[in-house]
Amino acid sequence: MVLDAVLARGRTVCKHNGLLILSVLSVIVGCLLGFFLRTQRLSPQEISYFQFPGELLMRMLKMLILPLVVSSLMSGLASLDAKTSSRLGILTVAYYLWTTFLAVVVGIIMVSIIHPGGAAQKETTEQSGKPVMSSADALLDLVRNMFPANLVEATFKQYRTKTTPVIKSPRGAAEEAPRRIVIYGVQEDNGSRVQNFALDLTPPPEIVYKSEPGTSDGMNVLGIVIFSATMGIMLGRMGDSGTPLVSFCQCLNESVMKIVAVAGWYFPFGIVFLIAGKILEMDDPKAVGKKLGFYAVTVVCGLVVHGLLILPLLYFLITKKNPIVFIRGVLQALLIALATSSSSATLPITFKCLLENNHIDRRIARFVLPVGATINMDGTALYEAVAAIFIAQVNNYELDFGQIITISITATAASIGAAGIPQAGLVTMVIVLTSVGLPTDDINLIIAVDWALDRFRTMINVLGDALAAGIMAHICRKDFAQDMGTEKLLPCETKPVTLQEIVAAQQNGCVKSVAEASELTLGPTCPHHIPVQVEQDEDPAAASLDHCTIEISELETNV
């Protein structure tokens, strides 16, 4: 009997969490396979062939980013009134800024305690040859990308100021330029001869940097988010005239989520090759660990403190709910973030986990997640603060309190401009370093371990987005309950739900929404705490509770 119960329990767990279990196993298998193949000395060409299944996974996820962001923001904001959408937007952005600043503070405290720069040795390297970008240009590029000049181009390119060195010619003719030649003699060791040397003291040419407009490959997610959010708000104010476009966006969003559900079974297979391929590409682990081990430990410890202590504590204090249960619901999205190191590519999976497992109101998820994937980079902000102070420690540069405050502010601002793409933090790191006068070429010191740390900080970014959706669903539950009667659902968005899912939805901000948005018929097994509305036939005598059904047209629990 006990064995049968255990087997039945195991089958139930595998049935409901099969994809999650496969994802966990794929991460373990990928690590083992990668370290085993390192002993086989594969050529770069063979490694590229080996990474092909993982490359397909990345391409599938990136393919879904654009339609998902546009459709979710436009349909989500169009279904809200102006007051509700403005309150949700203000609370979401304020929460994101606050948690990002907390992440920076945690990073500064950890790097000050561990002091990893004392164990690292700076090697004399040549100039990297990378274009120099000032912090002013980087901040202006952030603002420019918020308002793309060409919306079609924004889907595959973003604005990027290019800085090129220019030799400044002296005024006047070349012969008028000041030039001095010094001739001096040096006697040889035996004293027989004197060698004459000429030293040209012509001053070197002055080099200035010229900024020119340019572009870089990659989707301008920030500009698309701004445009889609504006369109969604305007569609909501247009009333019935904007309904066709809203319906199109809702159906597009639903179809994308169905594609995600089908493609999800390929994810464990692709994760194996993504992780194993990255392990094959990395440098000698022993040499990297000896040089940057304390730095990596500092970043990971900061991410653990912020992601597993501070963010869950905020969720518990605000919602009075168990954060472990919530985090378990988005565990698959965290594993995809670990494999892809891209919060934007993980966006479809995060949607799926929040709607199916945590039963978050889909309108909140449609707004909070795309915005969070663009501006909420807690892990990136923490990493940039740690890296900046680490570089200062390597150079024996003492930072005063004012410079630490400058780092905290610039790291918070720079993380907002970091697109949800792999290793975007290295680009915005220039802003943080130049704000306190640190050499930007020293970014090369941390590149060796950035590929691994990028995956862990992406997990924290995705976790912060998911917890933010849960917190906003709790804070704005009354606003959405009052606004529930104004939303019209498409047939493609109505699905049957169980009583357990109704109770779970009530706990995530839908206390009155089930009754107010739906036409419910009282059934014999319906809990008494769920407000219902009895729908009777024309003949009262023919009405029987045994033939009544429950129809829920509001709650969406399966994608």
Swiss-Prot record:
GO terms for cellular component: axon terminus; glutamatergic synapse; photoreceptor cell terminal bouton; plasma membrane; postsynaptic membrane; presynaptic membrane. Its main location: membrane. The chain crosses the membrane at residues 17-37, 60-80, 94-114, 216-236, 259-279, 298-318, 329-349, 371-391, 413-433, 456-476. Glycans are attached at residues 190, 253. SUPFAM superfamilies: Proton glutamate symport protein. Coiled coil: none annotated. This is Excitatory amino acid transporter 5. It comes from Mus musculus (Mouse).
